[in-house]
Amino acid sequence: MTSNEKEMGKSELLVVTGMSGAGKSLVIQSLEDMGFFCVDNLPPVLLPKFVELMAQGNPSLQKVAIAIDLRGKELFKSLVKEIDIIKSRNDVILDVMFLEAKTEKIISRYKESRRAHPLNEQGQRSLIDAINEEREHLSEIRSIANYVIDTTKLKPKELKQRISKFYLDENFETFTINVTSFGFKHGIQMDADLVFDVRFLPNPYYVEELRPFIGLDEPVYNYVMKWKETQIFFDKLTDLLKFMIPGYKKEGKSQLVIAIGCTGGQHRSVALAKRLAEYLNEIFEYNVYVHHRDAHIESGER
């Protein structure tokens, strides 16, 4: 929500949805701690009625978060339509947060919790089939989400910190750029809008004295950045982003995730993500955050 919208008294509604086992309950708990009025598992058909309550000006409903999942499959089909209708109103600002995780991670979480998947409560099918069906059903709502968060590699504390960063930052209403480094060997960054592969650059892994360090350490950072190939790539990348980013903002996107990947996610991608975040902070007035997903995984880059 922008400052102008707050001044005009518009209410804020956040719909939290996504894969079962991806962390919706934890997000709702975090939002409740931050002062949101939270509702868990509201049927989508009741969403317009709840918005009408918000529009009546009740102070306790100024900031609302509603978790909606796929338990009622038939009811869920109307969610995108209901969201479109609410977005056309001028008294409520609606955002959608979509949580997801890799299938193997969701399976692991369900085994730990010993709970049944909502699409497999009778145990009549395999868990992986239920997860795949859910992912297919959720593809449409994912496509309209303002925020897509992959929780595969996030610990509960890290997920809470990310939610806090979104909603406790006084500049939250501005366009946000998240720059992330990752290692392809650990899987691509699932929530990325733009992915850049820097595995063509000289690799510090093969310099024995640099191998134990990461791209945030000065010797590795300087090694990665000193090459002509790196400078040419960085110049071309920033030229492209200077052209693209304002366009994303103009089209109404509130968050852009830029992922930079190398083999292990410890050296080249970390150095480039660090430099890119610094550069974007210098030339734009947007919120720019940087995260190094795999930087502290035991070194094994090739």
From Swiss-Prot:
Gene3D superfamilies named in the record:
P-loop containing nucleotide triphosphate hydrolases
Q: Which UniProt keywords apply?
A: ATP-binding, GTP-binding, Nucleotide-binding
Organism equals: Staphylococcus epidermidis (strain ATCC 35984 / DSM 28319 / BCRC 17069 / CCUG 31568 / BM 3577 / RP62A)
For this protein, the record's Pfam families field holds:
PapZ_C, RapZ-like_N
Q: Which InterPro entries match?
A: P-loop_NTPase, RapZ-like, RapZ-like_N, RapZ_C
Q: Where does ATP bind?
A: 18-25
Keyword GTP-binding among UniProt keywords: yes
What's the domain of life for this entry? Bacteria
Tell me the protein family, please.
Belongs to the RapZ-like family.
Q: What is this protein called?
A: Nucleotide-binding protein SERP0433
Q: Where is GTP annotated to bind?
A: 69-72
Q: What does this protein do, in the record's words?
A: Displays ATPase and GTPase activities.
Give one GO molecular function term.
GTP binding
**TM segments?**
none
Q: Does the keyword Lyase apply?
A: no
